[in-house]
Every structure is written in C-alpha cells, then in structure tokens.
C-alpha cells in the first residue's frame, strides 16, 4: 500500500472524520490499558465489522452519527427519519445491546429481529473514558443477516426432509429383506 501526505486543500468527509475520531478514541483507550477488553465475546468471525454499518452513540444515549450502510439497515427495518440527535428507543429500535454494553463496560454481540422479518446482528463496543471508569459513548456496528437466517431455516427444512426420506427408504428395505 502507498501512504501519501494529505493534500493541504482537501477537507475530510464526515465518514472519514467520524472514523478518525473513533480511531483516536481507541488509541487513547489502548494507551490507558482499557483496550483490548479482557473478556472475549463469542464468535467474532461472523460479527459485524466497521464496513457493515456504524452508529455512534454518545454517553446520553443519543445517536451522533449513522454511516450510509447503517442508514440502509435502518431503512429496511422501517426507520425512515434521520436518527441523528434522537435515541434508539425513540426511534423504536431495540437498544438492549447498547444498554448492555454500557452496563457491563464490555463489548456485546446480539442478534435480534427488528420490524417485519428483518434480523440484525449488532456489535456494541463501549467507548470508555481513559481517565476514569465512565463511558463516553458506544460504537454500534450492525449487519443485516435476514437473508442468511432465511437460508439457514431453508437448510434445516431440507435436512429434515432428507432425514424423513432416509427413514422411509430404510423401513422399506427392512420390509423387503424380511
């Protein structure tokens, strides 16, 4: 990869600015010894990543930033208004993962159904204050896993059908052999 010096006339966009702020917050947590977190959270291989959709939430629980991918996920669950400046609860969005991350001061990964037949996987990482035990906010990464869960259910249904056919063929063969 190439590293270039920033152009003097170039102003960063909102996405770049927010990601840089999040990076700076994580570096201050690392310097204070508060990141990475001591406990591991489940299987992180399928957990949302920063490119899936990002929502930053401040210490008061108000949405401060929503990335374009997160905005698309919110639209799929029926939230069409601009969420910036409101709480997730006011929007009718499940805010349990955020509350759990703040209460435990540890990352939380939760999958839940939101709206009509939409399944979201959320990873909420508390942004700890490097100077004290407070929480400055939460970084919520979300992924729409509706299609993946639909395929899982379809696979389970096909598996049950194959088991039933196998059972019937086995019974027929036993009848013929006796």
Describe each region flagged by the PLM.
Residues 169-177:
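Short post-phosphohistidine helix in the DHp/HisKA domain of histidine kinases
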Residues 5, 59-62, 80-85:
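N-terminal functional module detector in eukaryotic proteins
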Residues 82, 143, 178:
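Short acidic (Asp/Glu) and glycine-rich catalytic loops that position anionic groups and cofactors
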Residues 2-40, 127-168:
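Sensory coupling linkers of modular signal transduction proteins
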Residues 71-89:
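PAS and related sensory helical modules
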Residues 1-3, 87, 93-147:
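PAS-family sensory/regulatory modules and their coupling/dimerization elements
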Residues 51-53, 57, 155, 163, ...:
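Signal-transmission coiled-coils
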Residues 31-65, 70:
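Sensory modules in modular signal-transduction proteins
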């Amino acid at each position: 990869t190439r590293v270039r010096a920033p152009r003097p006339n170039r102003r960063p966009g909102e996405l770049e600015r927010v990601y840089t702020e999040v990076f700076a917050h994580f570096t201050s947590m690392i310097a204070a010894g508060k990141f990475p977190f001591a406990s591991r959270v489940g299987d992180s291989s399928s957990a949302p990543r920063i490119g899936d959709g990002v929502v930053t939430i401040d210490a008061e629980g108000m949405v401060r930033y929503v990335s374009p991918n997160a905005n698309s996920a919110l639209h799929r669950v029926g939230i069409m208004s601009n969420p910036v400046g409101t709480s997730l609860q006011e929007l009718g969005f499940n805010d349990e993962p955020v509350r759990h991350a703040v209460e435990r001061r540890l990352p939380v990964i939760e999958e839940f159904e939101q709206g009509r037949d939409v399944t979201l996987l959320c990873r909420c990482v508390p942004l700890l204050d490097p100077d004290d035990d407070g929480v400055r906010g939460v970084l919520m990464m979300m992924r729409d896993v509706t299609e993946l869960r639909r395929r899982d259910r379809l696979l389970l249904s096909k598996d049950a059908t194959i088991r039933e056919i196998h059972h019937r063929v086995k019974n027929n063969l036993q009848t013929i052999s006796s």
